[in-house]
């Protein structure tokens, strides 16, 4: 088992029926987050999630801390959080497919990371978390301020919020689509500072701002559908097909 940049389970020499895992990987497609390797079989996900994690991991200390990952997907980041020293990781995501993808690996790694198939609005806890992550979730919310408020209430008094989101120079809420996505609201950095400080976060710091490139989000054998390239203008890769600025993402740490 390796929880490094490619989350890896097993060696192909350990198994007799090589087709079983090929069928599992194919049945559970599309794979959005990764990369993984399962008994020698690479799972090449749409997102190079290892690149995002590189932008985050040096900016937050997870050693001995309890972690909640909201909108966790298939748990790729949760395994990386455990590698970084988290004492426990709980993920929530409403997609049953992602929960099943996680289960495929968890049966070999162990139950160090739990993923619950529920939405944030339905999630309640007895013990708050030291660190709460929300990555790639905020701009999909109909009420982004309420999302931030809900996250803040899941933290210990000295807890840390890790927010990763699309950003725009000014708030962007297209009537139609943005990069083919419906119902998005993309905040500005100023919006995020204001909303987080209003919730009582005294230390809000932008740690990274990055243009999302087609080397990081793309179609693969394990996610064969259209991806970022098809959402960008054929004449100008710095614009979406709708004429908006192409995706730029920020990492914000608030405490």
Residues covered by each model-derived region:
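Short, glycine-/aromatic-enriched active-site segment of Class I SAM-dependent methyltransferases
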Residues: 165-183
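Short alpha-helix
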Residues: 184-200
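Conserved class I S-adenosyl-L-methionine
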Residues: 65-73
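Conserved SAM-binding loop of SAM-dependent methyltransferases across substrates and taxa
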Residues: 74-85
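A short SAM/SAH-binding and catalytic strip from SAM-dependent methyltransferases
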Residues: 130-144
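A short glycine-rich, Lys/Arg-flanked "PGG" loop and its adjoining helix->strand segment in the class I
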Residues: 145-160
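N-terminal accessory regions of S-adenosyl-L-methionine
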Residues: 1-50, 107, 178, 193, ...
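Conserved SAM-binding strand-loop segment of SAM-dependent methyltransferases
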Residues: 110-122
């Amino acid at each position: 088992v390796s929880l490094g940049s490619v989350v890896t389970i097993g060696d192909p020499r350990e198994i007799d029926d090589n087709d079983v895992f090929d069928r599992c990987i194919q049945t559970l497609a599309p794979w959005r987050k990764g990369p993984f390797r399962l008994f020698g079989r690479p799972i090449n996900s749409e997102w190079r999630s290892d690149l995002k994690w590189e932008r985050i991991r040096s900016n937050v200390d997870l050693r001995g801390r309890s972690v909640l990952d909201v909108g966790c997907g298939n748990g790729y980041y949760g395994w990386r959080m455990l590698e970084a020293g988290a004492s426990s990781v709980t993920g929530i995501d409403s997609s049953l497919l992602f929960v099943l993808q996680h289960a495929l690996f968890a049966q070999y790694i162990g139950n160090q990371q739990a993923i619950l198939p529920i939405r944030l609005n339905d999630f309640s806890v007895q013990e708050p978390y030291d660190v709460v992550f929300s990555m790639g979730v905020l701009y999909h919310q109909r009420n982004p301020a309420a999302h931030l408020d809900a996250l803040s209430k899941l933290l210990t008094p000295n807890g840390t919020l890790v927010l990763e989101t699309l950003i725009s120079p000014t708030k962007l809420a297209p009537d139609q689509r943005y990069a083919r996505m419906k119902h998005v609201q993309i905040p500005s950095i100023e919006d995020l500072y204001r909303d987080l400080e209003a919730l009582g976060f005294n230390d809000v710091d932008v740690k990274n701002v990055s243009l999302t490139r087609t080397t990081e989000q793309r179609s693969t054998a394990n996610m064969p559908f259209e991806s970022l390239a098809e959402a960008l203008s054929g004449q100008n890769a710095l614009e979406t097909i709708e004429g908006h600025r192409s995706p730029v993402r920020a990492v914000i740490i608030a405490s």
